[in-house]
């Protein structure tokens, strides 16, 4: 009988803990980010292979620069060859702040990519750690 009582007490404690966790998870602190959507631009696919390589290297350097500044928190390409080429998520006050950071990106500057921006509401503290630098 003691064993049955012990099991019931433990089970009720676990259920209460699960209910508390579920309630806590629904109370995230929210904040506004800027979602950037990269699409093929009017000059997509133009130029020589050398130009494309130089532009892509500059594009990646700009991504690193924005990430190191703590402004670009998520970036990545799409997995197919459609018009949608990639996404950025910025921790920035406005699309104008993002525009100032991205207007020097060679892929955007050359018209190979076009950046569309939208305010985006999500959980505060959104981060993706670089596996090379995560400790």
Regions found by a protein language model. Give the residues of each.
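Hydrophobic alpha-helical segments, especially transmembrane helices
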Residues: 1-3, 60
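Sec-dependent N-terminal signal peptides
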Residues: 3-12
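Conserved, structured core segments of small domains
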Residues: 17-135
